[in-house]
Design a protein with these regions (language model features):
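A short, flexible low-complexity segment enriched in Lys/Arg and Gly/Pro that occurs
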Residues: 26-63
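Extended polybasic, low-complexity segments that bind anionic RNA or targeting/receptor surfaces
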Residues: 1-41, 87-202
Length: 202
């Protein structure tokens, strides 16, 4: 194919610890929830009484003014004071690394079982042209897929990003969201050992 380099190597054996794991829906759901929660920015910031600057000095004396006593201008009762029960959220959801890896293996195994996972030869585009990506995917016979490679090749990434039905992912960066969103998964030969390392439960 013009503009596309394919490296022919012997097709590797699919390691059972990555592609022959029983699907665990509960574990996969937990991994997906954890991943999505950790992607949230949590940019909303409300200041409670302790977060507001100033207010170290008592605003006026305790008695003799006729006003209600006050100890600080940071009180929620004052204009410019803190917010009562400020909604300060940390969306981070931690998950045991071993469980997270098992969830990824579970997803990959499900794709293999359902015959939605295809091994392809290593590929790289000489130029970052969408046309080259279209020609490559047409040869695979799938109309929508996620291509997983051993490393993030810049030309390949740029060539694929304009295609709505196709995605590109470095094997080191696989996550439950992108995997589950895919209709079909294409895995390059050189990505197999990387995937094995990523989901390796020690």
């Amino acid at each position: 194919m013009a503009g596309t380099e394919t490296k022919k190597i012997t097709a590797p054996r699919l390691p059972s610890e990555v592609f022959s794991v029983e699907f665990n829906q509960s574990l996969v759901h937990q991994a997906l929830t954890s991943y999505l929660s950790n992607q949230r920015q949590g940019s909303v910031k409300l200041k409670n009484r302790s977060d507001v600057r100033g207010g170290g000095k008592k605003p006026f004396r305790q008695k003799g003014t006729g006003r209600a006593r006050a100890g600080t201008i940071r009180s929620p009762l004052w204009v410019g004071g803190g917010v009562t029960f400020a909604n300060i959220k940390n969306h981070e959801k931690k998950m045991n690394k071993k469980m997270a890896k098992k969830a990824l293996a579970s997803i990959l195994s499900k794709f293999k079982t359902e015959k939605r996972l295809t091994l392809v030869e290593d590929v790289s585009f000489k130029e970052p042209k969408t046309k080259l990506a279209v020609e490559f995917f047409n040869k695979t016979g799938v109309d929508s897929a996620l291509l997983i490679t051993s490393e993030a090749d810049q030309n390949t990434m740029l060539a694929i990003r304009n295609l709505k039905s196709f995605g590109f992912l470095d094997a080191k960066d696989i996550n439950p969201y992108d995997l589950l969103k895919a209709k079909h998964i294409l895995v390059t030969h050189s990505a197999i050992p990387v995937l094995k390392e990523v989901v390796n439960v020690k």
